[in-house]
Amino acid sequence: MTSDAAAPAASASFSDQAARLRDGARAAWRKRWVRWLAILLSIPVILYFVLWLLFARGLPSAETLLTYQPPLPTTVRDINGEPVQSFARERRVELSYEEFPQQLVDAFTSAEDKTFFTHGGLDYPGFVKAVINYTLHIGSGDRVAGGSTITQQVAKNLLVGNEYSVTRKIKEAFLARRIEHVLTKQQILELYLNQIFLGRNAYGVQAASRAYFDKDVSQLTLPEFAYLAILPKAPNNYDPETRTERALARRNYVLREMEKNGKISAAQRAEAEAAPLGTVRGPQNSVRNIGGYFMEELRRQLLDQYGEGTEKGPNGVYTGGLWIRSSIDVAKQRAAEQALRDGLMRYDGNRGWNDPGLKIDVAGDWRGALARAPFGVGYPDWRPAVVLAKSGGTARLGFTDGSQGDLPSYAAATPKRGTASPAFDFLTPGTLVAVKRNGADWQLKTIPTIRGAMVVEEVASGRILAMQGGWDLKGDDFNRATQALRQPGSTFKPIVYSAALDNGLTPASIIVDGPFCVWQGAGLGNKCFRNFSGPNAGPQTMRWGVEQSRNLMTVRTANQIGMDKVTRRAHDLGVGDYPNYLSMALGAGDTTALRMTNAFATLANQGRALKPSLIDYIEDRNGRVIYRADTRPCEGCNAPDWDGKPMPRPPLRTKQVVDPMTAYQMVHILEGVVQRGTAVVLRDLKRPLFGKTGTTSGPTNVWFIGGTPEIVAGVYMGFDHPRPMGGYAQGGTLAAPIFKQFALEAFKDMPAIPFRAPAGIRMVRIDRRSGQKVFGAWPTDDPKAAVIWEAFKPESEPRRAFGRDEEAQPAAAAKPAKRAARPQAQQPRDSDFLQNQGGIY
């Protein structure tokens, strides 16, 4: 047969076979069991596509997990790079899979998913069981757990959510299959161990290791790995403090599972079962939580810039994993906290016990209520406590860690403020108290009602090294360093005199310390300014007026040069914007401790403006710098190219707001305030210091601001709702000692560097009382010596001079002027403007 004839024959044979198959299929379909079998086989396929259409089509892509970034806390470090604070809603430290110890992986897979490394994302028997259990418990209110693999838990936690329903389980199943095709087993486990919530606000195994054992996960032991592995389903059910036996039983179950799965030997299991839980009390944090008010101000600034989460971008404060180098100096911060608290206690601590007025229910969870109460005790060795019971002469106290102690009546014998009865009589169950350890018992302490603030600033940069805005942030988050508007009193006077030095006056200029009144118009009469005490001194030098904080000399000077120049200088120094009223010259305008401290730091910086900053720079989670406080370019700042060349210097950071010679003259005058003026209490610090005291009318606030060429600190005290502090209260007696205590600690390792005069300043010997130039005599170390060095601008020094034999004349000449001053009783009484020394009306 030829090939041409064979082709039609083959075609006919194929057609016959197809026809026979069709006939066979028709015959088979006529049989009932074949039809039922086909229907049964098609149901799963149809069901799968229906489920896919209903649940899987709109699910998020598993590929997003390849670039998933978990919420990470913001870590704040101090000036030396040490961690001091963190901001987070979820405490988490991200680790790579290689950083997980193998026994940790074995413990979690044994407890949560024994077939994790072999299944394809689902444990089918467990999945079906979970769906059936859910169906059986519909309407019961019970939440049935089980059936979820680690992959499903990753899908639930990161993509689906925690809704309790069959639909969520089905979505989990679809996503688990997708995840297994996108990620490796190691990547899935890395996501899981970094994301899972394990109690004590710890997310991920590293944070949990710190929270429960106060060490890194790499340092844990086998029984500690097993304990962490029992926590994912219900951390509270295995709390090591309240449910110890249940936690031990479950931990030992995990150890037995590890042995059954061949991960550990019988000997290892037995040794681990014999070990206690070994957890620490309460959540532990790897950072030190230093500088409450400083960190709260820093947090506010970060929230303004970056937001809480992702609403302003990927660098949210609570989720972005920012790395912040702050300007806080821990040693100076602690010194500021201690000094301010001690100063508040010196004023208020001996006035009786102040009941904080806080109570909790001791019949319930008093530990949690005590921990949440807005009650800060300030000192590290004081503790907040609640009175649990009272019997006879003893009150039983409870503490946040669950421990208890006794407060005997003799340790609470201080009268309650406003009464003659001992504080012990007013203690009832539920009362919150501050106590300090006294041998085996405790002693009642009182929280002062007066408040204050302290700011410490670096002169060269404007960096804030320390900030204390009150007694304790926990009991009071109002930051008086930045938020409290207060009248600065006489600390404002250097602003007046610096403007005067720019407008023709010198430190030796003679200004009359005598009556000064301003006509206010018909029906209002005169407004007459007065000094706080003593007769008016007559003509005196500007220096003397600043050192003795004379109000009459200040308002006379402000009136002479024009208040517009004074308010312009206050604006340039960042103190505030004020109307051109003479009362502003005496500190009647509101400002903050931070602004005033920065103004004094600007003077110490030879008049160059400073921008107070709490942050040096910020890095995102990938180490990229996203903010830097100092943005100056530095041309040639490449070390290998320095050889044989001058050291490169970046441009100056800010503009000149006060003439450098004027700024130095003002600082030089303010050194006299410490040597022989209202801040003489600081003289025995025996180092170059400048500063100014302030006391406002009432007196309601007391101030001191000053420092060295390197550091300036400002402090004030006063009640939040202004009321008189008592006639003896002055900046020199209350605020300056706070600065002194701070300086003794903060400056002890700092060299005593003198203030540096700028180019053009001439240092001239003058008589400090008359302001006349002296020849034939020299200044001495005696702060009250007649002859001193004074700073003058070119061509401004006194022309007339007198010799050594005339040195005593100025003091004698001043006496008639003092006697000639008008007695206080004869001064005008119309709308008197009563002044405290260093104060306002």
Regions found by a protein language model. Give the residues of each.
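Active-site SXXK
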Residues: F108, M258, A336, G392, ...
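Soluble, non-transmembrane domains of envelope/secretory-pathway proteins that act on or interact
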Residues: M1-S3, E63, R281-V287, G320, ...
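Conserved catalytic neighborhood of penicillin-recognizing serine enzymes
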Residues: H137-Y164, S218, P283-I290, A460-R463, ...
